[in-house]
Amino acid sequence: MMKMTMKMMVHIYFVSLLLLLFHSYAIDIENEITDFFNKMKDTLPAKDSKWLNPTCIFGGTMNNMAAIGEPFSAKCPPIEDSLLSRRYINKDNVVNWEKIGKTRRPLNRRVKNGDLWIANYTSNDSHRMYLCTVITKNGDCIQGIVRSHVRKPSSCIPEIYELGTHDKYGIDLYCGIIYAKHYNNITWYKDNKEINIDDIKYSQTGKELIIHNPALEDSGRYDCYVHYDDVRIKNDIVVSRCKILTVIPSQDHRFKLILDSKINVIIGEPANITCTAVSTSLLFDDVLIEWENPSGWLIGFDFDVYSVLTSRGGITEATLYFKNVTEEYIGNTYKCRGHNYYFEKTLTTTVVLE
């Protein structure tokens, strides 16, 4: 009985020690996070920091993109930030928004589920700053700043799908509405005809349309129409995006790699050599070529030796450039590696004096 008691005491001691260490470590992490945001606050321009309440914790800044004539929404930075969100995501918290600049103006009528919501973003809203304040049920407050910037959405985004790539999962088409959340629903059209989401040929998950059992006939124009409700006037707002889908037959992804075995150079002069991949695939960017130095490191845009990649019409080339050949390069062997999802090939070339 005494032995069991001693074992239990030792066990309890070690468990307590581990809990104490973990608690101490957690406190250190929290303190480091707070210090990080305090330092960020210190770097703010005076014209921004003057709007902050000195009694509130600072929770960072965010830059959000917006599209003219479309809805725009933004979360308060401490709720969106991965370091702080677990502290401040709580349905009982209150989030207030203000527009700041020359003056400050409350925006409580432009709030949806705690997020800033602008139903029709105009050029007058561009580059504006917004201050949000999260008030917890304990009365603590934390503030963040959001800046909005205009970005014009692409009119129609081309997308290519090759049969046999991942047919059992289907083709995923993403409706690229990234400027506003809280939409009601999304309807999809193919070639101006509404798609019936029957969960057989077509299914829908959030912003994605999934086309099952892909076929060449699935090529076409796909439009997604996103429906919103305005906070104030309850009018339906519709925003659209477009994809041009081209379904192609399964391709032959084999390719031929071409490279001279020697680089003839002259000391003190520049030199270059090109490694070429010739593909029969319709996917012109199917093959990627990389150069490796004698130590096996990839060569990028270094000062003395660098590589430039080009691709056109099924031919991919990577040219290795020597800015100024010195004796240390003589005898070095460089590897050209061509690869795609299916195949990989390598060839080598050696630097020799002419």
From Swiss-Prot:
Q: Which InterPro entries match?
A: Ig-like_dom, Ig-like_dom_sf, Ig-like_fold, Ig_sub, IL-1_rcpt_fam
A UniProt-annotated Pfam family: Ig_2
Disulfide bonds, paired cysteine numbers: C76-C132, C175-C224, C275-C336
Q: Name one GO cellular component term.
A: extracellular region
Family matches, as Gene3D superfamilies: Immunoglobulins
Q: Which GO terms describe its biological process?
A: symbiont-mediated suppression of host innate immune response; symbiont-mediated suppression of host type I interferon-mediated signaling pathway
Leader sequence range is 1-22
The similarity annotation says: Belongs to the interleukin-1 receptor family.
Q: What functional role does this protein have?
A: Counteracts the antiviral effects of host IFN-alpha/beta and key IFN-inducible proteins involved in viral RNA degradation suxh as host OAS1. Acts as a soluble IFN-alpha receptor and thus inhibits the interaction between host IFN-alpha and its receptor.
Give the quaternary structure: Interacts with host IFNA1.
The protein's name:
Soluble interferon alpha/beta receptor OPG204
Gene this chain is encoded by: OPG204
